[in-house]
């Protein structure tokens, strides 16, 4: 990708929008809606850094060790994260949060979530 400043758009690429993705294990969806969409605006040459926009239908997943460092900004929807010690935090539209790599948590999307993300492997 070219090195230049760019705007992250909440609907993905203006020409193609967001595309189906499969980051979420199918068995974790909590309804018949298994929709998941993504658009990556930036990927470093080795893909150790990614930024984009992602959307998922409601799901609940126990994560033993979060696989990346990730900063997120919620565009719409809601997600509740529960740490290994039982502390829960709910994030909604406009909230910005960070999950360090290796974090044990429960990821519970209670209504369709759309977020901007920046990932560092």
Where do the protein language model's features map onto the residues?
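A short, N-terminal "cap"/entry segment at the start of jelly-roll beta-barrel domains
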Residues: 1-48
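Conserved short histidine dyad/triad with adjacent acidic residue
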Residues: 40-43, 47-66, 100-101
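Short hydrophobic/aromatic-rich beta-strand segments that constitute the beta-sheet cores
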Residues: 63, 81, 115-117
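Short, conserved beta-strand element in jelly-roll/cupin
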Residues: 65-81
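Conserved catalytic-core motifs of eukaryotic protein kinase domains, centered on the activation segment
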Residues: 84, 110
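Short acidic-glycine-tyrosine-enriched beta hairpin
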Residues: 85-101
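Short, exposed beta-strand-loop hairpins at the edges of beta-sheets
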Residues: 105-108
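A short hydrophobic beta-strand segment most commonly corresponding to one strand
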Residues: 111-121
